[in-house]
Amino acid sequence: GTIGKRVASAVSAQDDMEVVGVTKTRPSFESEVARYRGFDLYTPQKSIELFEKANVPVGGTVEDLCGKVDIMVDCTPGNVGPEYKAVYAKAGIKAIFQGGEDHSLTGISFNSTANYKESWGAQFSRVVSCNTTGLLRTLYPIDRQFGIEKAYVTLVRRAADPGDSKSGPINGLEPTVKLPTHHGPDVQSIMPWVNINTMAIKASTTIMHMHTVTLELKNPASTEAAVEAIRNSSRVRMVDSASGIKSTAEIMELSRDLARDRSDMYEIVVWEDGVKAAGNTLYYYQAVHQESDVVPENVDCIRSMCKVCDAADSVKMTNQALGIPYRC
């Protein structure tokens, strides 16, 4: 899927990791692409016949793959995790789940910057969603420097991924009427001390999410100091509208021009000229590439759970392998 294929590519780019195989439930074009990229395919037992009829060779079942790996990165759709967690537990292997699952599935949620150590040596962990990852990348450094009294965030969410022809709306704005949205509690699974409220709207776009953030700070900040706090955070890219980046469209054009794999923008993009501090209140906009921002977090989570190295070293290695400018 969207995240799984990217994680497989990112892991294969690391010097200290090996992708043993990837799983698919049906012999789609993505299965062929996975084989083209050199990945061995595995599938649930019930899908073996489908692959045989399509003449797509597989290396075995999901259970077979579990017997060959140290850790599984589970990128199945939300709410499927409990079923596969039982499979991984029976096999005695570690597993990482994604933000579509509840925090309660693992009891640990992961972010490279904010709580890398919490997953150290764990059998199961969960990388939070794309939007939550985006919020943590900027909220954490601001909280460390100024303290956050309260956070108010409105998320303008893409309606569907670019490769999704089934979701919508395609001509409208759809509010999430159940409030607050899940994003605030998800942030609190990693930063439980932050008082945060979130609202969300789905918009007729496919390429990125947009956040408008208003923070009440414990200590006053200047605009310049706030910009520096955000700029110095790893996996945040500052842009300026005067350079021509006025929307998410230009951000994705920038990513294509950087020749990233699949044109991915792993960093959270913040408009420097859209950051404004007024006493204890801070305002800013940020854009989130929902297809890719969690990918480097999954790589770092592997190292934490396998007790490979500390957070700074892992982030540096991951960033170098993926072409992300590194900041301490």
Feature annotation, model-predicted:
Residues 81-83, 247, 291:
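Intrinsic-disorder/low-complexity, polar/charged segments
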Residues 12, 143, 231, 303-306, ...:
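Hydrophobic/aromatic-lined pockets within catalytic cores
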